């Protein structure tokens, strides 16, 4: 895991000036910050595994997946593992297909994560979404956690919406216009605001 992004401290100062709730959260959660794993393949696998299941279930499946890979989660290793072995890890047929196709695209050089460095956020989301089992939410998680993009606001994320409801005393789901208002307010540091909102509802900081 790497250090926090270069923009982190500037973002905290900016958000504290912009919003009272954000100031309260930033002052409360001083023990940690966004940690980055500079391994796109690893993070994509983790994102696919974590789709539509609880955090605890995702962690359990990922642990078994890591053991199946003998602690070497890379395209060549994953490409060589039989689907039957991945099924025993607790992966659904769709997720196995997504992970296997991802590994194959890496091995055959049909997917190049370095291209994302030259793309804006929307271009990168489109490029990542071309991968099987990777939709907008998964692409946003990759941009936030792996590429450290500063202005990701994942409005499809249940945790973010719940945190907005809790902290701003709104119904669940919070009104779309209010979520959009916060987006504009926190820009260009929505990723940092998202991280602190997540932190307010989860004892352990989220990592990918």
Language model: regions and residue ranges:
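A general alpha-helix detector
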Residues: 43-48, 64, 81-85, 123-127, ...
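A positional/architectural concept
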Residues: 10, 17-71
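C-terminal accessory module of base-excision DNA glycosylases/AP lyases that mediates lesion recognition
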Residues: 1-32, 122-123, 136-145, 149-208
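Alpha-helical ds-nucleic-acid-binding substructure associated with the helix-hairpin-helix region
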Residues: 21, 25, 54, 58-130, ...
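Short alpha-helical scaffolding segments that buttress acidic/His motifs in well-ordered protein cores
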Residues: 44-49, 99, 103, 142-143, ...
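Structural motif
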Residues: 34-42, 90-94, 183-190
């Amino acid at each position: 895991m790497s250090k926090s992004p270069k923009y982190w401290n500037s973002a905290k100062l900016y958000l504290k000036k912009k919003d009272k709730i954000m100031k309260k959260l930033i002052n409360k959660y001083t023990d940690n910050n966004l940690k980055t794993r500079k391994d796109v393949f690893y993070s994509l696998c983790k994102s696919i595994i974590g789709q539509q299941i609880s955090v605890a279930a995702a962690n359990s499946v990922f642990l078994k997946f890591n053991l199946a890979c003998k602690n070497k989660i890379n395209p060549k290793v994953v490409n060589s593992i039989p689907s039957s072995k991945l099924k025993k890890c607790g992966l659904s047929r769709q997720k196995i297909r997504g992970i296997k196709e991802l590994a194959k695209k890496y091995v055959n050089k049909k997917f190049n994560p370095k291209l994302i460095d030259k793309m804006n956020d929307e271009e990168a989301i489109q490029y990542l979404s071309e991968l099987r089992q990777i939709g907008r939410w998964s692409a946003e998680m990759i941009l936030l956690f792996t590429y450290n993009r500063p202005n990701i606001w994942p409005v499809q994320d249940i945790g973010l919406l719940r945190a907005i409801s809790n902290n701003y005393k709104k119904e669940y789901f919070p009104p779309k216009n209010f979520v959009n208002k916060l987006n504009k307010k926190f820009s260009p540091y929505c990723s940092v605001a998202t991280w602190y909102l997540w932190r307010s509802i989860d004892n352990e900081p989220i990592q990918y």
